[in-house]
Amino acid sequence: MNKKCDELGLKNTHFENTSGLYNDNQYTTPIEMAIIMRAAMDNPVCAKVLSTYQYDSTPTDKHTEGIKLTSTMFSRMYGNEVEGVSIQAGKTGYVYESGHCLVNYAEKDGKHYVCVLAQGTNKWHCIFDSFDIYTNYLP
């Protein structure tokens, strides 16, 4: 990821692990997270992962029916879509040090938008704050 960040020209982002768990040397800014999301949506594999509501993993010896993985963003927004806006992809996050976070990718009238929210005090605030932004600030 750090190599990709260099390719994208990001100067205020650095990754130390792939889990997203807190590390003093792992950081980004909202603007750079938006750039990362835009780049991820240009990658067909990343776009598919970020836009999938639910996925059943391959069965294993320990999980003979596979494991059902559900997007926390899509499950939280279910039934509360923003009129005229299609939220197509996103990723939630939470660590104590950063609070609840969200990056999502939306489309309205053929134009694409990225919304980044951080330091939320509750898992629902980021979702509904992004709805408010899309409702009140998109042309």
Regions of interest found by a model, annotated:
Residues 1-139:
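Penicillin-recognizing serine hydrolase domain
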